[in-house]
């Protein structure tokens, strides 16, 4: 993210909606009562909430004063919200968002299903799961005790993330003072940023924004070391994608110093990836390759946020700059319309963050033309997943498609921010881009 002096000015943040990010392993068949969302991982994720907690998706819409998912999607895409949508103050916003987590983690009952003598109370340790009575909490403890500590981090991060939305949390930036080849993981990255990082975090901890944030929640502010840790986790979550792209470029030794710059495609880009993205969010990729002559990062997917959509062909790439743009389409359609026609250059690298094609036949059907295209055109391709289980399932699919796997394993630049499975809070939290796979063309002939 660019320093404050370089960031474009933003209007007052729009009314915030809870962004529902469901790990792909939770996506399951769509209920017949709901319209088929197509190849949208965002829509599938939202609808699948009801599989674990019946009625949860409607509770979320109710708290936002919305009738259906179409209204929800309209607003997060920048459309005009219904007149009843919005929050009168920040305190109300946080309360409404917290209300969307209010269901019994054991019996799955929602607030409207409680008897008159019962009330949902949160776990006092993590403040992140709710129970309708002590019996449910006692019965759930064997499962919850395994994740309680991590879910406490999730609860803090969920609040602190608002500082990224408002722009109060500006990540440290600027050319790397160390040699790029010395930065191999988060430990070396944090060591390199050193005093600059500590100065940024300490200034934010003592800021008026931080004070008002916790005051609006109406609960005690955590200790400084807890908040410090949260800010560092959020930082890795923002920077994980650009640095993972850099990992891909390093793996296949792409010549980033070529005339005209390099083109990177992020395929299957979700709304979560592109909502509120800022021009400086990928600057760290440039610092990773100080000799680069320009990066054009194009995000392609059916859920790309409206603010990112623009005509990529009209942008001239200046040496040393990074340009972000988006196209709302399936990748193989985008390829036919933009690449085969010569409007845009062939990509040097293609990346898919959590494509989820292993989890749903519908998603696999949508991804198959893209995977075959990338294989047949021998485009270096990077894929990230949440877990070892997803890694193994995705590898098997790619092997069955006869792709040539050139690298895979734990991602040294995985996000360190734990992600709670929304409708199944006692499921082990996952971490974005925890593992990666790279393939290039077809498997060599035996």
From Swiss-Prot:
Signal peptide range: none
UniProt: Zn(2+) 1 binding residues: 104, 107, 132, 136
Residues at which Zn(2+) 2 binds: 123, 126, 144, 148
Pfam families the record matches: MSS51_C, zf-MYND
This protein's UniProt keywords: Metal-binding, Zinc, Zinc-finger
Domain of life: Eukaryota
GO MF assignments: zinc ion binding
Zinc finger regions, MYND-type: 104-148
The UniProt record lists the keyword Zinc: yes
InterPro entries recorded: Mito_gene_expr_regulator, Mss51-like_C, Znf_MYND
Name of the featured protein: Putative protein MSS51 homolog, mitochondrial
Source species of the chain: Mus musculus (Mouse)
Gene of this entry: Mss51
